[in-house]
């Protein structure tokens, strides 16, 4: 009663606090279920907590072409004529207070790039979006129109001192973004907002880029495989050698497909995968460095009576996280 009605839990902290959001607010909740702060912003998918800041995909709405920036008006998407188009942003909030520190629109950054600007508008798809109506948000079906959803940002990773070395010119704090509509990953300088690196076209409708300790970029590729054993796969790109390695794919004994969502998490060098639309969480048991040889082990399934039950797993934890001290904090009287 004292908090917003949660839709997604983004993160649980060791002191028992929880970061949650719904269609209107993002909020931090105490370990005794009291609201610490709430901020009225539309957020979605996943982001990163870094240096006491939250970096998460934000969303606004605009009418095209009148609300397009000048660079966007000069290229193909300048012909778009649509109201309430989705506008993707990098939303940065103070973790302690919920204050909005900055909100960066991504489209002007892409439109100013000599190569990626030419790729805008080639993707046509059917998707649902949230439409504003008296400050409430409801799902509305759209036809195949790229103008409604030009980028569809679905993840933000922050480059750290541990992985900046895997790129030629990355710096701690830079943004690694996953742009679903463009089938593109892009690295953006966090100060100049210039594009430093990008990777595209080797995956379709991807989510959840993750960098391993060895410089391997893992990507949940939603629709990059064939339909025989499922269209999804886990792609591995060697950032140092600049080439793709064999991927993990479905097979005769393991069907793998999530058309939407999907997430990869890494704990102690082990790969955990949420296949959201299948309602399954599995671990890849890998005995060598070839991802193709990894064996999936189902850890959780929401399926009942052989029927898929789609879930949205926002965060996955090892059981060691929930130590006695943590449980005492959330169970205190």
Indicate where each model-derived feature is located.
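Histidine-/acidic-rich catalytic cores in large beta-rich domains
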Residues: 1-333
